[in-house]
Swiss-Prot record:
Transmembrane segments: none annotated. The gene is hisS. GO terms for cellular component: cytoplasm. This is Histidine--tRNA ligase. PROSITE patterns: AA_TRNA_LIGASE_II (PS50862). HAMAP family: His_tRNA_synth. GO terms for biological process: histidyl-tRNA aminoacylation.
Length: 425
């Protein structure tokens, strides 16, 4: 049998490979989102890329598109039914419960994560079957200040990246006291509309999901739909107003969106979304909200919680839409070019020493000639290049070239590390 060549294989439909130099931009976005979280008491958490199917069926909601249409589900040889994670909030809560972190006496448990999610969706720009998110969860406390904190931190992340053209949409979904009354009123309204059979079925299971339907013909019929804010109980009204006051006092601009719902069933009270108008139909770059009942839905105790997830892929698209170029330092500061075997041995040792001292250094591999090696040095983005030839060896020096100014200086071989550390600060 003839083995296929490597070029026969391509990334699966709806996925992409993240390659240098573009990957540096994605790493910078992840770091910009994570930095304010680390500065605010959030510890890093990592969960498996797959979980028990029932975790998502119970937590995300059996009637959601994610569970019914979009999950990658498989059965192990041992008979376990698992799913690649379509989102990470339910897995994070599962991990916290399993490790009994909620019993350590220091609530809320504040954690952040970064990782891949998988959904079988129709691929288009900004919507992939494999995508990356950075998320944050504050588990075990019912406090408007926590909701406000997370919204403020996400806003801070985007501002740090230089983004300006994003909007924050805010709403309250009520709680177990007032939402059932609204649910019944919304169902009565939806039954009187000209909706397809699938949408009517969804309206009976979870009518709030119909409000999230993006089809123009459905949205047109929803213009007179009852609004949840008119059904909020006094406690939910007071809670939501405090969230609004706290983020306003922090200088965060937001828009009240009474029809905002999220695509996951576990949200209660505060819900919010970050949208960017430069992304077309896939305008949401992130979102989240409060999920006070999720712990009980997956078999745990009552643990009111709040969190969000921001899409790394869509944030990068938002940066491109605004024409923002991130100031990403070169991955290499020094590039070494040996000309000959003895020079190769000496410079390789110096590059190793530079790296041990924290200097980002690379080496011309493959026995390239001077011209090809200098092209590689240029491509690396290195500030300085070290060139060591036979004449230099005889004199005990190396040529140090400043790639910005073009200035070239001969320095002693034994002075390389100290000289470069001094120049690079």
């Amino acid at each position: 049998m003839t083995r296929p060549s490597v070029s026969t294989f391509k990334a699966p439909k709806g996925t992409y490979d993240l390659l240098p130099p573009d990957s540096a931009k994605f790493l910078a976005v992840r770091e910009a989102i994570a930095a304010p979280l680390r500065n605010s008491g959030y510890g890093y958490i990592e969960t498996p890329g797959f979980e028990n199917v029932e975790l998502f069926a119970r937590g995300v909601g059996e009637s959601t598109d994610i569970v019914t249409k979009e999950m990658y589900v498989f059965e192990t040889k041992g008979g376990d039914r698992l799913a690649l994670r379509p989102e990470t909030t339910a897995p994070v809560l599962r991990a916290v419960l399993e490790a009994n972190l909620h019993k350590a006496g220091n609530l809320p448990v504040k954690v952040w994560y970064s990782g891949s999610q998988y959904r079988y969706e129709r691929p288009q720009k900004g919507r992939y079957r494999h995508f990356s998110q950075v998320g944050a969860e504050a588990i075990g406390a019912e406090d408007p200040a926590l909701d406000a904190e997370l919204i403020i931190l996400a806003d801070q992340s985007y501002r740090a990246l230089g983004l300006q053209d994003f909007r924050i949409l805010l709403n309250s979904l009520g709680d177990q006291e007032c939402r059932p009354v609204y649910r019944a009123a919304l169902q009565d309204f939806l039954r009187g509309l000209d909706l397809d059979e699938e949408t009517l079925r969804r309206a009976e299971i979870n009518p709030l999901r119909v409000l999230d339907d993006k089809r123009p013909d459905v949205q047109k019929q929803l213009t007179e739909a009852p609004l949840l804010r008119d059904y909020l109980c006094d406690a939910c009204k007071a809670y939501h107003e405090e969230v609004r006051e706290l983020i306003t006092a922090a200088g965060v601009v937001f828009e009240d969106d009474p029809k905002l719902v999220r695509g996951l069933d576990y949200y209660t009270r505060t819900t919010f979304e970050f949208v960017h108008d430069g992304l077309g139909s896939q305008s949401a770059v992130g979102g989240g909200g409060r999920y006070d009942g999720l712990s009980e839905m997956i078999g745990g105790p009552s643990l009111p919680s709040v969190g969000w997830a921001l899409g790394v892929d869509r944030t990068v698209l938002a940066l491109e839409a605004e024409g923002i170029e991130l100031d990403i330092p070169s991955a290499t500061s020094v590039f070494a070019v040996p000309l000959g075997e003895e020079a190769r041995r000496i410079l390789f040792a110096k590059v190793t020493e530079l790296r041990k001292n924290g200097v980002a250094a690379d080496f011309s591999y493959g026995g390239k000639g001077l011209k090809a090696a200098m092209k590689a040095a240029n491509r690396s983005g290195a500030r300085y290049t070290l060139v060591l030839g036979e004449r230099d060896l005889a004199e005990g020096v190396v040529q140090l070239k400043d790639m910005e100014s073009g200035e070239q200086t001969a320095i002693g071989v034994n002075e390389i590390v100290a000289e470069l550390e001094s120049r690079l600060g």
